[in-house]
Amino acid sequence: MSKVLFVKGNPRSVDESVSVKMYQTFVDTYKEANPNDEVIELDIYNEQLPYLDSTMLAGIFKAGQQLELTAEEEEARKVADRYLTQFVEADKVVFAFPLWNFTIPAALHTYMDYLARAGVTFNYTAEGPVGLMGDKKVALLNARGGYYSEGPAAQLEMSLNYMKTMVGFFGVQDPVTVVIEGHNAVPDQAEEIINKGLEEVKKVAQSF
C-alpha cells in the first residue's frame, strides 16, 4: 500500500478551472484503480499558509543548529515542518496547478518554500547540492490557456518549468507531466482540447 499526497494549487472550483478538473480526474481515477492506497488531499488555498518570513527562517535555522528558539520562531517552524514531513512521508505526490502570470500561484510557491530544506529534501556537498527525494514518484498536472510548449511564448513559461526544477532539485529526475493548453486561445476548440487532456490524465492516473 502506498501513501499518496495530492496537492491542489488552485482556489477555483472544478467548473471554473481546468487544472482543478485535472486534479479531480486524477484523484477519482487513482482511487478507483488503487482502492487500498492511503490518499491525502491537500488544498493549498484552504490551508492559509503564512509566507516564509524572517521568523520562520530563524526558527528553521536555529532548530537545525540546535539553538534556542523564541515561542514565535518555534510556532512558525512547526507550521513549515508539518507540511514538509507530510511531503517526505508520501510515496507518491501529485501536484495540479495553473499557469498564472507566467508562473505558479503564490500559495503553491509558499508551499514549495516549505519543502526546500537542507538536510531533508536535499544536501549541500562539495560537488554541489544533491537531492534526497529520488525514490519519490511525482506527477505534475499543468493547465495554461495559451500555447507555451513551443514558439516565442515558450521562454515565458515558468510554472511547469519551475515545478520541474524544484522537484528535480529534490532528486526527482523524471516526474510524470500532463499539460492542457490552448483552450483559451482557441475557444471554439476548448471542449475538445480539455476532454483530450483529461483522457490523458486518466491514463496516467491508472498507471501511476
From Swiss-Prot:
Catalytic activities: 2 a quinone + NADH + H(+) = 2 a 1,4-benzosemiquinone + NAD(+); N,N-dimethyl-1,4-phenylenediamine + anthranilate + 2 NAD(+) = 2-(4-dimethylaminophenyl)diazenylbenzoate + 2 NADH + 2 H(+)
Report the co-factor binding details. Binds 1 FMN per subunit.
Name the top EC class.
oxidoreductase
Q: Which domain of life is it from?
A: Bacteria
- Asked if the keyword Transit peptide belongs to this entry, the reply reads no
Q: Which UniProt keywords apply?
A: Flavoprotein, FMN, NAD, Oxidoreductase
Cite the EC number.
1.6.5.-, 1.7.1.17
Residues binding FMN, per UniProt:
S17, V18, S19
What the protein does comes down to: Quinone reductase that provides resistance to thiol-specific stress caused by electrophilic quinones.
Q: What is this protein called?
A: FMN-dependent NADH:quinone oxidoreductase 2
